[in-house]
């Protein structure tokens, strides 16, 4: 109603883009074309001619396949064989010793290690569970290789957001989120303002560099629209 475009920028690489559109639509938020995922950022580092080992969920698998690259899903193709140009990692519940071993072999063979995000945990109604970043960290430890991280708060995700907002000055953008270590850092990567929502993840605004601090998303909107 205010004439402001809203992008939903998420480190969720597990759900497909359509699933994320549907989830937002179910709560009355039409968002088709306005969702940016860490899976989308991960594939910006992939070439269509590559052979890619995917250690991730269906959202990441879908995005890798869409590039045209030969896509091998690590837990669907055992035993994994041959060489790879990249290993792309995201949250998935199938992670086990064999996935770690296959990723190790591929990376040691020269594959580029790409992490969709470095979030250590993933929120659920029953509390946090290990996130995609924990899986990336395990593969980094095993291989001795530092992954290229593409999601928030890193540069590839920022580049993707800029591409989706042609003609928009970053000085006019506001990153809204509840974590300074990802959302605030992403705002700094983009070079835009940061609005911190005190949702419980960050209980107060102390020691956080934010342009706006509010107890809720509605509070952020009110401050942004108040002259």
What are these regions (language model features)?
Residues 2, 12-34, 39-227:
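Asp-based, Mg2+/Mn2+-dependent phosphohydrolase catalytic module
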Residues 5:
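N-terminal phosphate-binding loop and flanking beta/alpha elements of the actin-like ATPase fold
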